[in-house]
A protein has these predicted regions:
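Residue-level signal for inorganic ion chemistry
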Residues: 155, 200, 261, 291, ...
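Conserved C-terminal structural/oligomerization subdomain of aldehyde/semialdehyde dehydrogenase
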Residues: 68, 114-127, 150-154, 443-589
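Short, well-ordered beta-strand elements within core beta-sheets of diverse protein domains
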Residues: 142-148, 239, 344-346, 376-379, ...
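N-terminal Rossmann-like NAD(P)+-binding subdomain of aldehyde/semialdehyde dehydrogenases
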Residues: 92, 111-228
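Long, intrinsically disordered, low-complexity tracts enriched in Ser/Thr with interspersed Pro
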Residues: 3-125
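ALDH superfamily catalytic-core signature
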Residues: 285-286, 319-457, 519, 587-588
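Rossmann-like NAD(P) dinucleotide-binding subdomain of oxidoreductase/dehydrogenase enzymes
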Residues: 219-354
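Structural signal for hydrophobic packing residues in well-ordered secondary-structure cores
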Residues: 148, 163-166, 170, 181, ...
Length: 589
């Protein structure tokens, strides 16, 4: 892969701008009712850049209102226009915003032009493209073959456009989450937007470094030579995301797909229709030949029968097996982010109150609809009663409003709802076994945080992933028995251990197979971009986050560049005793 990290030459920029003007005048590469307008005013004064809100407008094609930049930037720019003095830090921020907006102005249509589309259609006339989605994939593959996505500057531009869109659609995103999940703005920022923006900012800041070919030292046998490892995009990738974290689990993989130089087919969940609608509007800035959002029922029905170059799927193990079976004939590489029953172990030397607080938060986050949530808790029998009381205390503080005068507690209506109505009945049935220590009531699609005791490994709730606001509590006496038990069941996506003994911690880390986890906390390993996130066995394969998101959507390609001025004759026929002796010495035989 050719390195295109150097700055664009003025002549190349001019050429791109001229091409875009020609395309806009004829309506090429612009979807119906879509329009992106950017006008950046430039002043001749070298000491200042003056920009006003009127000069910086992006109009999303389907959005209800124009995309706006951050208000603070607009105010600073307005002050600059009036001649007020600024600090160097403010001037630097304005300059960065100006550069980004200029990039958006210059940058470039992301799809095929009209003639290329006609040519593509002609070439595929005789191809067996039996489905509407198959035609989209064919167009995307044609666009990928233009090599536009190989340009690092092109990729950076698209990531910056995406960042602006996310900021512009903030209110619509929060509103959609309230409708589909009953999720508050704070939770949307904490569990969705915050993670997306952190990943996006990291990728933009590090893409040039990540994409740069890595030099490797070569052996004496290949003297003289140079070795390189390049990161190649796969081509047309498919991203299928679930309903529990519909924005985060859609956009983070998409960031990797764009950064890696791929085109993308994105299938959000049908169970969160309002969020899916916002995602589609937000991503409408990209041409369908580059990023396509699947929402049509006809396309969804046969989506996994279509040949892709790479698949990133987040969902259930059952559906993952179906996908793997259908894609086996194509030998399609894929990453599967699944789930399972992630255990939480609370040992006798744990800080009981802090452990209960962190377990309760991790378990009932998003109403338990989190793939890495503690599915059940194994508490040492010596501290079981104290742990249960502490857990009940924290459930009350987090999710109930206290009415001291009336001497009662009232469940808060702001708790996240169960998305699928069928799951409400399933969860109610799971609560029929054991002792309900607190909760246990359903209010429509909202189920109160529930604590269950009096259970063992044979109960129904221990045979399937809970994926809801029910926390089963079991007891144990010997950690070694727990480790032996875990070797007999499916490997979990996550595991959490609370305790202080270093020997016990080392046993948990080394003798139990799990995707990832925490010592003395829950969930938080997911938030670290330097820690790879992924499952093992039934809980998934492959990983991502941070640099590994870029690596997930690219493949390593090895290149040996051999010199011409010297040629080692050892490898060529005929063999002599001297050659054999040298070879044995070299290979230490």
């Amino acid at each position: 892969m050719k390195n295109n990290n150097s700055n664009l030459k003025n002549s190349e920029i001019g050429k791109n701008v001229e091409e875009d003007k020609q395309k806009n005048s004829t309506g090429e590469c612009i979807k119906k009712n879509e329009e992106i307008k950017l006008t950046v005013g430039q002043q001749k004064d070298n000491t200042r850049e003056k920009q006003t809100d009127k000069e910086n407008i992006i109009k999303p094609s389907i959005a209800e209102k124009p995309l706006k930049y951050d208000n603070s930037d607009s105010k600073e720019e307005s002050k600059s226009a009036k001649g007020e003095e600024k600090t160097s830090e403010q001037q630097k921020q304005i300059k960065e915003n100006s550069l980004e907006k200029n990039l958006l102005k210059e940058g470039q249509s992301t799809g095929l032009n009209k003639q290329e589309k006609i040519s593509n259609a002609e070439k595929n006339e005789d191809n067996d493209i039996s489905s509407p989605l198959g035609k989209v994939v064919a167009r995307q593959r044609k666009f990928f073959e233009t090599n536009k996505t190989l340009d690092i500057n092109f990729r950076l531009l698209q990531l910056k456009r995406l960042r602006l869109q996310i900021k512009a659609y903030y209110d619509q995103i929060c509103s959609a989450f309230r409708q589909d999940l009953n999720k508050l703005e704070f939770d949307v920022v904490l569990t969705e937007l915050g993670i997306v923006m952190k990943e996006l900012n990291y990728t933009i800041s590090n893409l040039i470094r990540l994409a740069k070919p890595k030099k490797v030292r070569t052996s004496l046998a290949n003297f003289p030579s140079k070795g390189y490892v390049l990161r190649d995009p796969y081509g047309v990738v498919m991203i299928a995301s679930p309903w529990n974290y519909p924005l985060q689990l859609t956009l983070v993989p998409l960031i990797g797909a764009i950064a890696g130089g791929n085109t993308a087919i994105v299938k959000p969940s049908r169970n969160t229709p309002n969020i899916t609608k916002v995602i589609k509007k937000m991503l409408s800035i990209f041409d369908e030949d580059y990023v396509y959002i699947v929402t049509n029922e006809e396309e969804i029905s046969d989506i996994f029968d279509t040949k892709f170059d790479f698949i990133f799927y987040t969902g259930s193990p059952k559906k993952a097996r179906e996908i793997a079976e259908k894609q086996a004939k194509y030998l399609t590489p894929m990453i599967l982010e699944l789930g399972g029953k992630s255990p939480c172990i609370v040992d006798k030397d744990a800080n009981i109150d802090l452990s209960a607080k962190r377990v309760v938060w991790g378990k009932f986050l998003n109403a338990g609809q989190t793939c890495v949530a503690p599915d059940y808790v194994l508490v040492h029998s010596e501290i079981k009663d104290k742990f249960v009381e502490s857990a009940k205390k924290w459930i009350g503080k987090f999710y109930y409003e206290h009415h001291l005068d009336a001497q009662k507690e009232e469940f808060l209506p702001t708790f996240v709802k169960i998305v699928k109505k069928s799951d409400v009945l399933r969860l109610q049935n799971l609560m029929k076994e054991g002792v309900v220590e607190c909760g246990g009531k359903a209010h429509g699609q909202v189920i109160e945080p529930t604590l269950l005791t009096g259970l063992d490994w044979d109960n129904k709730i221990m045979q399937e992933e809970v994926f809801g606001p029910i926390m089963p509590v079991l007891t144990f006496d010997d950690l070694d028995d727990v480790i032996r038990k875990f070797r007999l069941i499916d490997k979990p996506l996550a595991l959490y251990y609370f305790g202080k003994d270093k020997e016990a911690i080392e046993k948990v880390k080394t003798q139990i197979a799990f995707g990832g986890g925490c010592i003395n906390d829950t969930i938080m390993h997911f938030t670290e971009e330097k820690l790879p996130f992924g499952g093992v066995g039934q809980s998934g394969m492959g990983n991502y986050h941070g640099a590994r998101t870029f690596y997930a959507f690219t493949r390593e390609k090895s290149v040996l560049d051999k010199g011409l001025w010297f040629d080692l004759t050892l490898r060529y026929p005929q063999a002599t005793k001297g050659k054999i002796r040298f070879a044995k010495t070299y290979f230490k035989i």
